[in-house]
Amino acid sequence: MIKLVLIRHGQSLWNLENRFTGWTDVDLSENGLSEAREAGAILKKNGYTFDVAYTSVLKRAIRTLWIVLHEMDLTWVPIHKSWKLNERHYGALQGLNKDETAQKYGEEQVHIWRRSVDVRPPALTEDDPRYEATDPRYKTLKKGEFPLTECLEDTEKRVLAYWHSEIAPTLKSGNKVIISSHGNTIRSLVKYLDNLSSDGVVSLNIPTSIPLVYELDENLRPIRHYYLSMDGEVPEGEIPKHISF
């Protein structure tokens, strides 16, 4: 049996401020740092270890992974970073307060932008200061690859391309893997692994910094999945609450 651990980054500064983040590179809040330490302690207490780690090129996911591995005394584990594991790009919504945006455009429209599978938010323009295609971390992207906006379907395509080319072969080689990423990135992976319909993924929420374990067969088909707490596996349908750490 193969085990895969997925973890969404700890609370970010813009999570705290209720702002659309997307590819904006904001850091963890103090609470997010605590959540990451707690996740590492949970994994260590439950006897987990890793051979390889994957994350995005955004600091909130990277720092969460660093902290988790530090808490587990696994700072030596190789870390592979890819923009393909970045959060969904929220286009012109990035940086805006979610409540204020709902007041401006209507709650129904914002809900469609946030939760539908195939509807993109308004796009950035290339002269927008939030357009970061010249950032050196994206220098390997080909012309036209840097998104101006994304729907979940767009995010899923790049995430699954990286899954099939990099992560799946690593798992099949017998390596224990952790992925530290973002809410919509993990939603994309869960949708694929659990073969969820578009309707099924609409209501799927991924909590910050709670380890989500997938037990997979040799073909990487899920046997079962569950969240972890200090007391071990959490009953299906329940999500553990954070403790002060």
UniProtKB/Swiss-Prot annotation:
Top-level EC class as recorded in UniProt: isomerase
Classification via PROSITE patterns: PG_MUTASE
Active site (UniProt): 9, 87
Enzyme Commission (EC) number: 5.4.2.11
Catalytic function, reaction form: (2R)-2-phosphoglycerate = (2R)-3-phosphoglycerate
Pathways involved: Carbohydrate degradation; glycolysis; pyruvate from D-glyceraldehyde 3-phosphate: step 3/5
Biological process, per Gene Ontology: gluconeogenesis; glycolytic process
CDD domains on file: HP_PGM_like (cd07067)
PANTHER family: PHOSPHOGLYCERATE MUTASE
Family, per entry: Belongs to the phosphoglycerate mutase family. BPG-dependent PGAM subfamily.
Main function: Catalyzes the interconversion of 2-phosphoglycerate and 3-phosphoglycerate.
Protein's UniProt name: 2,3-bisphosphoglycerate-dependent phosphoglycerate mutase
UniProt organism field: Bacillus cereus (strain ATCC 14579 / DSM 31 / CCUG 7414 / JCM 2152 / NBRC 15305 / NCIMB 9373 / NCTC 2599 / NRRL B-3711)
Lineage, opening ranks: Bacteria, Bacillati, Bacillota, Bacilli, Bacillales
